[in-house]
């Protein structure tokens, strides 16, 4: 930020951030701002956001709080269902795995597409990544497990030390079966993790290492 931008920000009472998840580093910076900062949750179909999460101050929370006119529920797969009649005529079925709390607030755990089914245990990649930042969790096909949890890391040569650390902090069924070092984590044009490319890259690397598996 240049000085002019900082001064302009100080004069702002409320700042709303949308368009994607807010990472931990940004949240840390935001926490020091005098401005009230909120993260929004919404979809293209809802035209605008339908819930807010306070990122700083005494009211900071990991939970999103929906607007009064919005009703939320979960599908059988724990994906979020949105009923927002003021902005959308139809009930919306999302691909976001969520948890709804008794006070009506909710947390987004990750995308349905990013659930790894490893030996019958369903593992949310985004939840593991919160514990393992800056590493990325993906999966590769596995004859016994169906999908094997795989950790991708960039420019980290000591995989043995990392493996030992993972053994300490993760339950057995969450521990990555493979730890792969790559030059850089594939990203989309808007800077998000390219999940599809990560899966392809991990599979190709393992086929190179173990061509007969």
Model-based region annotation:
Residues 3-58:
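Gly/Ser/Thr-rich phosphate-binding loop
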Residues 38-45, 64-65, 136-141, 180:
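Beta-strand->loop->alpha-helix junctions that form or flank phosphate-binding loops
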């Amino acid at each position: 930020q240049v000085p002019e931008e900082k001064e302009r920000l100080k004069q702002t009472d409320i700042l709303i951030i949308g368009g994607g998840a807010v990472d931990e580093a940004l949240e840390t910076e935001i926490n020091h701002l005098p401005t009230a900062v909120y993260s929004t949750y919404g979809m293209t179909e809802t035209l605008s956001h339908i819930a807010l999460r306070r990122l700083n101050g005494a009211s900071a929370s990991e939970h999103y709080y929906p607007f009064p006119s919005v009703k939320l529920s979960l599908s059988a797969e724990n994906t979020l269902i949105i009923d927002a009649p003021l902005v959308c005529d139809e009930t919306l079925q999302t691909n976001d795995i969520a948890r709804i709390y008794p006070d009506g607030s909710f947390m987004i755990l990750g995308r349905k597409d990013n659930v790894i089914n490893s030996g019958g245990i369903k593992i949310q990649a985004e939840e593991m990544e919160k514990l393992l930042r800056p590493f990325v969790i993906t999966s590769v096909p596995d004859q016994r497990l169906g999908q094997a949890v795989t950790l991708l890391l960039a420019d980290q040569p000591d995989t043995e030390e990392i493996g030992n650390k993972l053994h300490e902090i993760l339950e057995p069924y969450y521990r990555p079966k493979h730890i792969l070092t790559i030059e850089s984590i594939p990203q989309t044009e808007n800077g998000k993790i390219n999940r599809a490319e990560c899966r392809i890259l991990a599979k190709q690397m393992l086929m190179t290492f173990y061509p007969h598996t």
